């Protein structure tokens, strides 16, 4: 009468099937929620006279900003044991990180503080199957140390930096981790001949593994270098960025170092592919790098994918 379309009622058969259809919908699995890729595991290596406890703030920051991240702060060579020869430490840390890497199919990140940064760089050299994405070197003397610090005065109370080479460049001295990266710019020949660690991982002295170590190091996804002028321990502080003194104690930046110009272990190649990040920050003392929130947010968090 009003020209409206006729409405048809559901058939009896449909009404009978309706409860079963509703039950079927309830039993079907729900559509999965959008999945965000998990953060890569983070491995932390401490420095001289240090332990895992020192990194409680860093652990807190990572848990807050990247919840669910598996963070392992390695508890090896703590306290005075950190004075053990660095190659001995490298072997110990290698045994600890290998199973973590093996389980992390997407790779891992390394955060390595002070002396630990040298341990980690050696790990990247000797491990031919490592899968490190970001190696974050946190105030580490990557080109060596040449300065009077409280640590040195405690260990060698009768020596000054000008004559410490007499101890460090002896077989006895090389049994101490500090001497493994002592780099006296006034006695370069002695350093090159006597250094059992730094001169080798830098490729400054020929050895049978140099080519393989360079290849291994270049498996690295990204090298993040962190340090600053108010560190107070790393001397020169530019060593954190692969800068160092010449014979006149003038600091030459990384790009003027022979290890870079010769690309002896891969620095030049990394820089050419845009894989080196430099993050200098003033106002932070050596023992505060791993607890400074601003430093974490600026220089560390962006590289923890």
From Swiss-Prot:
Its main location: other. The active site is at residues 114, 231, 286. It comes from the Eukaryota. Pfam families: Palm_thioest (PF02089). It is found in: Lysosome. It catalyses: hexadecanoyl-CoA + H2O = hexadecanoate + CoA + H(+); S-hexadecanoyl-N-acetylcysteamine + H2O = N-acetylcysteamine + hexadecanoate + H(+). One of its GO terms (cellular component) is extracellular region. Its EC number is 3.1.2.2. This is Lysosomal thioesterase PPT2. It comes from Bos taurus (Bovine).
């Amino acid at each position: 009468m009003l020209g409206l379309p006729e409405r048809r009622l559901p058939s009896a058969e449909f009404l009978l099937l309706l409860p079963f259809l509703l039950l079927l919908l309830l039993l079907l699995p729900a559509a999965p929620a959008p999945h965000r890729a998990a953060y890569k595991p983070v491995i932390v290596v401490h420095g001289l006279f240090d332990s895992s406890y020192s990194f409680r703030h860093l652990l807190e920051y990572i848990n807050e900003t990247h919840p669910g991240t598996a963070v392992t702060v390695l508890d090896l060579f703590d306290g005075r044991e950190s004075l053990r020869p660095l190659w001995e430490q490298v072997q110990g840390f290698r045994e600890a990180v290998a199973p973590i890497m093996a389980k992390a199919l997407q790779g891992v990140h390394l955060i390595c503080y002070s002396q630990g940064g040298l341990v980690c760089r050696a790990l990247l050299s000797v491990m031919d199957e490592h899968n490190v994405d970001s190696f974050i070197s946190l105030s580490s003397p990557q080109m060596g140390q040449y300065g009077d610090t409280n640590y040195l005065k405690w260990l060698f109370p009768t020596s000054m930096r000008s004559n410490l080479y007499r101890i460090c460049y002896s077989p006895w001295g090389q049994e101490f981790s500090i001497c493994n990266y002592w780099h006296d710019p006034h006695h370069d020949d002695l350093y090159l001949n006597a250094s059992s660690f730094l001169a080798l991982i830098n490729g400054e002295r020929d050895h049978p593994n140099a080519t393989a170590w360079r290849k291994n190091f270049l498996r690295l996804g990204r090298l993040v270098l962190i340090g600053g002028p108010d560190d107070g321990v790393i001397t020169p502080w530019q060593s954190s960025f692969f800068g160092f003194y010449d014979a006149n104690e003038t600091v030459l930046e990384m790009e003027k170092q022979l290890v870079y110009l010769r690309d002896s272990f891969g620095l030049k190649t990394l820089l050419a592919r845009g894989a080196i990040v430099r993050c200098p920050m003033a106002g932070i003392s050596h023992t505060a790098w791993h607890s400074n929130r601003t430093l974490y947010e600026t220089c560390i968090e962006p590289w923890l994918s």
